[in-house]
Amino acid sequence: RLRSEIDHVKKQCASLQSAIADAEQRGELALKDARSKLADLEDALQKAKQDMARLLKEYQELMNVKLALDVEIATYRKLLEGEECRLSGEGVGQVNISVVQSTVSGGYGGAGGYGGASGLGSGLGVSGGSGYSYSSGHSLGGGFSSGSGRAIGCGFGSSGGSSSTIKYTTTTSSSSRKGYKH
């Protein structure tokens, strides 16, 4: 009877050792599977970060283009308002447009200028142009000038990031005529 209990305990011990071995094997497989899933998730996270950085860069470039176009629209609007005032006979003082600079990365650069002239005679000339080029960055330019006693100019430049600088000055000359009755 003692021998049968010993045999029974040995069988239980063997069965428990087998269960332990099976549990260790299942644990190792689960650990390998978890490590594989972790590696896949880390790869997906790295790819998501790269995609996010690329999308952020594209967004910043689009915002820079939008800013430049907004500046150009504001400049043309001011030029048109100045022309309307000049044609209606109202005096136009000096007008300045200020634009907050936005820098993304690297450096920034900009250029602007203004000029004025007056003379006799009448005439009106308008010229304008804008361009856009893309090559690991972007560049925008625009220009406008009008004659008839006034010259107006603006400039915009961008390099290695983004910036916008506009200087816009309007000068007018006026004369008064007095009529005499005889």
Curated annotation (Swiss-Prot):
GO terms for cellular component: intermediate filament. The record marks 27 as: Stutter. Gene3D superfamilies: 1.20.5.170. Residues 161-176 have a biased composition (Low complexity). InterPro entries: IF_conserved, IF_rod_dom. Residues 158-182 are annotated as: Disordered. SUPFAM superfamilies: Intermediate filament protein, coiled coil region. Residues 1-83 are annotated as: Coil 2. Residues 84-182 are annotated as: Tail. Keywords: Coiled coil, Intermediate filament, Keratin. Residues 1-87 form the IF rod domain. Belongs to the intermediate filament family. There are two types of cytoskeletal and microfibrillar keratin: I (acidic; 40-55 kDa) and II (neutral to basic; 56-70 kDa). Heterotetramer of two type I and two type II keratins. PANTHER family: GATA-TYPE DOMAIN-CONTAINING PROTEIN, KERATIN, TYPE II CYTOSKELETAL 6A-RELATED. This is Keratin, type II cytoskeletal 59 kDa, component IV. It comes from Bos taurus.
